[in-house]
């Protein structure tokens, strides 16, 4: 799994480098300490976080954040932990709701969300983050192709609602 992406938007990877050495920052407090700056929530996002640098007292070299961001699936896969801020806080909620009884998504999420949830959770806790998975299929058109706005083969929900009522859309 390629964890990093070379994109502008995304979760900044918390690694700073002077070209030869790397420092992994583990918390906002640690970043404030090494940079000597009081940070705001906005400072933790691009482009502001890329402006946070510091000079190493021993070598005089400047540390800058590496430009990559994390793959968006990492954020999704970290959900069981991130939603409570666990392990820094939220232990009671985490223990109460982990692992989830079930998760549900369309079948195309097998490679994305289901996998990253499982990969991160087994790496961190040694166990699956969910007990059951419910996979939904895709809604197909008259030619048995997946309906897609980009293909232009969707049925407009308001037309179905007006012609057949809300129950036809509720499933």
Sequence positions of predicted segments:
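Structured secondary-structure scaffolds
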Residues: 1-171
